[in-house]
A protein has these predicted regions:
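Short acidic/polar hinge/loop motifs at secondary-structure boundaries
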Residues: 114-142, 188
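Face-selective signature of the C-terminal outer-membrane beta-barrel domain
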Residues: 246-268, 292-446, 450-452, 458, ...
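Gram-negative outer-membrane beta-barrel transporters
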Residues: 536-539, 557-644
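Transmembrane beta-barrel wall of Gram-negative outer-membrane proteins
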Residues: 178-215, 227-274, 294-311, 315-317, ...
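Outer-membrane beta-barrel signature, preferentially recognizing the C-terminal barrel domain
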Residues: 298, 352, 408-411, 454, ...
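A beta-strand signature from Gram-negative outer-membrane beta-barrel systems
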Residues: 131-166, 721
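C-terminal beta-signal and adjacent terminal beta-strands/loops
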Residues: 38, 638, 662-722
Length: 722
């Protein structure tokens, strides 16, 4: 439900565009005020009978958690993604993205009752389905399904395929102060069917999610007594074209046989440049000019496929995934004095190649109605190859290489699991899974001594249940044993040219293991009004955090046990019941705490950078009798400090993020939307405390604080279909 599900599209400040935005808001608000002056009875009658400019009535209340296509007509959706986002109280989760393998449930989206293939992004998959092809969307409970790992709310999108060629497109021009406009951000999707009915379906997407951004900032440096001794005025710009293409194929060669193939390729051509003037305050000396740059020419290829067919009294399914990523990057930094000239420069180059291959087989059968079994086996291979080189240039010298270093990190993994789903009564459903994982983790310095592989055997599994108190109130509980997914870059050393906060390699790193528990209460009050609260906790062993290595090394490693707990609230409030037709308020609020013993000083603290509080409140008004909609949002994310060997960092925003939007749903058949972000003019901040040695032995040397001023951001969007 959040309006921030897609990357923000930054834009700027044309006065006529901004005035047009607020003019639309004023007109829409005037219509709203006039409508609010009517009696409640009249408003309720309008909610049932009045047709808007789109010729659609206010959405009827869904029956039996099924949302027919006409429920969404008021919003004039273009894709299935637009429809799912308007389901009260529902949140899309990506599931396996960033998790270990394919056997942990996946995204909470089904298409015609089927799980998405491999690690397919549900946002991309839904955006490729035309809204007019959607028959209905039914909210189901994961514990009642025969899909291992799914729990909580699951959206099952029923799609009616068609042979006709259809397409959707969107264009998102971006404008922003002091930056060139970004005019190429957009997406085009073509879909249809070839051959006889039920034959080959296809969806082809071409897109560019490129962005440009920039800010000006002033950084202050103070000594241990709080005395300002240096200021730094910085101006930076960055951006990245992200062209890509995706192809999705579905094939039904004969009844009960299904095949899917998804392939996606995209580039990420990032560049960043920053110029700063460093001015001493308490000491004599010249200003220093610094220049830093970063670039990356990344390409990504993702492919996944599956084939499902009946065997004996059950169904056998094979799934394959291939991910490849190449990421050559560079970082540079130089210092110059206006009086004495060049002072020094450095450059750090890195070439990284990442590979993931997964194969999985699942066999499922149902011996009786409502009782499902599945046995699964999965194998995976992950690998990271990295080559790095540091270059230095001193006054009067040339750029000289400091030696090439190379690393390889790989993991072979196999797992097997047995999953069972069944009702335990007319109101209680249960799903349980037990499994075991074997993995072999190896790391090596290709330019130095080899490191032998380490082998692990770990249990995995979960128990998930749903108790249906009545037709509108569900209680869900889940207990899971999870093995974490490592970031292979954490094994590898890294160089920080600007701040001199380098990372040491650590080949002893192992995945964390966790016991996860949650209880969720989900209440539907009718007419689209929902409230859901989830309480959760985790006990983590082999916690991945920052650890000391040797006498002065700072690396990513394992620090023992940690605890994490919190609650999440998601609620939708529709205004129709209170005489405000077409209005809705969506609320998300998360609170979290965590505890781990600091590896240097032993005191309890939060996990590094862990979430503390996050909220997102979105208001929307689809004005009855018109094609206009308007609204806005406020949101914020507050995270904990990050502890390193010689420093403590914290970053965030000094107030809530804010936005206003106005939308017209039918301008010559197109949907036009203007959104003004950062209405309150917030600034991002970064704070750092540096010590003159390790935190356990040194004292505070200095504190640093910087604030980035981005200004207002205006985004335009034009959407159409054919």
């Amino acid at each position: 439900m959040s309006i921030f599900n897609r990357p923000l599209l930054a834009a700027t400040g044309s006065p006529c565009l901004i005035s047009g935005l607020f003019a639309g808001l004023i007109v829409s608000q005037a219509v709203s005020v006039t409508a609010a002056a009517q009696t409640v009875d009249t408003l309720q009658a309008d909610a049932r009978t009045t047709e808007g400019g789109t010729g659609q009535t206010v959405p009827p209340a869904p029956a039996d958690n099924a949302y027919p296509a006409d429920y969404f007509a008021l919003y004039v959706p273009r894709t299935a993604l637009d429809m799912v986002r308007r389901i009260p109280g529902f949140q899309i989760t990506r599931g396996d993205t960033g998790r270990r393998g394919l056997g942990q449930g996946g995204a909470n989206i089904l298409i015609n009752g089927e799980r998405l293939t491999g690690k397919t992004d549900p946002f991309d998959q839904l955006s490729q389905i035309q809204a007019e092809s959607v028959v209905e969307i039914r909210i189901r409970d994961g514990a009642t399904l025969s899909i291992p790992g799914l729990s909580g709310q699951v959206a099952d999108v029923t799609v009616e395929r068609t042979r006709a060629l259809k397409g959707t497109w969107e264009w998102n021009p971006q404008f922003r102060r002091r930056l060139e406009p970004n005019l190429t951000n957009g997406e085009l999707t073509l879909s249809g069917e070839l051959g006889e009915a039920g034959g080959l379906t296809y969806a082809l997407t071409l897109r560019d999610y490129g962005f440009r951004s920039g800010a000006r900032a002033t950084e202050t440096l103070r000594n241990a007594d709080g005395v300002l001794f240096e200021t730094r005025d910085e101006d930076f710009q960055n951006g990245a074209p992200q062209p890509g293409a995706a192809l999705n194929l579905g094939w039904t060669p004969r009844p009960d046989h299904k095949a899917n193939l998804n392939a996606e390729y995209w580039q990420f051509n990032f560049s960043r440049s920053a110029r700063a003037v460093r001015t001493p305050v308490t000491s004599a000396g010249d200003d220093t000019l610094t220049f830093s740059g970063r670039g990356e020419d990344e390409w990504n290829l993702e492919m996944d496929a599956d084939y499902e067919f009946p065997v004996l009294s059950g169904t056998l399914k094979f799934i394959g995934v291939l991910d490849r990523e190449s990421s050559p990057t560079f970082n540079s930094f130089s210092r110059t004095s206006p009086r004495t000239g060049f002072l020094g420069a450095s450059r750090f180059d890195q070439e990284a190649e990442e590979t993931e291959v997964i194969g999985r087989a699942e066999y499922g059968w149902s011996p009786s109605e409502g009782r499902d079994w599945q046995i699964a086996a999965e194998g995976a291979f992950n690998e990271l190859d990295v080559e790095q080189q540091l270059f230095l240039r001193r006054p009067g010298g040339v750029l000289e290489g400091q030696g090439l270093s190379a690393f390889n990190v790989s993991e072979d993994r196999a797992e097997a699991s047995l999953t069972h789903s069944r009702p335990l009564g007319p109101r209680l459903d249960l799903q349980a899974s037990a499994g075991v994982e074997y993995s072999s983790l190896s790391q090596s310095r290709l330019t130095g001594p080899q490191t032998e592989a380490r082998e692990f055997v770990r249990p995995k599994g979960f128990v998930s249940s749903t108790y249906k108190v009545d037709d509108s109130f569900d209680i869900r509980a889940r207990l899971e044993r999870e093995v974490g997914q490592l970031n292979f870059f954490d094994f590898v050393a890294a160089v920080d040219l600007e701040d001199n906060l380098n990372r040491t390699s650590n080949f002893d790193l192992v995945p964390s293991q966790s016991w996860l528990g949650s209880v969720e209460f989900d209440k539907d009050f009718g007419d689209g009004n929902t409230f859901r609260i989830e309480f959760y906790g985790a006990v983590i062993s082999d916690t991945v955090d920052r650890i000391p290595v040797g006498t002065d090394g700072d690396a990513v490693g394992n620090i023992g046990k940690a605890h994490r707990y919190g609650f999440d609230i998601v609620s939708t409030i529709k205004g129709d019941r209170w005489g405000l037709p077409g209005t809705e308020l969506n609320i998300e609020f998360d609170w979290r705490d965590s505890s781990v013993d600091d590896p240097l000083l032993g005191f309890p603290r939060r996990l590094n950078g862990d979430k503390e509080i996050a909220y997102d409140v979105e208001y929307r008004h689809d004005v009855t009798g018109t094609d206009w909609a308007y609204g806005g949002s406020v949101s914020r994310f507050i995270s904990a400090e990050r502890f390193r060997l010689f420093s403590i960092d914290r970053n965030g925003v000094d107030g809530p993020n804010s936005s206003l939007f106005v939308e017209h749903k039918d301008v010559a058949g197109l949907t036009l939307r203007a959104t003004l972000f950062n209405v309150l003019g917030n600034e991002e901040f970064f704070e750092r405390t540096r010590f003159d040695g390790r935190r356990d032995a040194g004292i505070v040397r200095q504190t640093e604080e910087i604030k980035y001023n981005f200004g207002p951001i205006l985004s335009l969007s034009v959407e159409g279909s054919f």
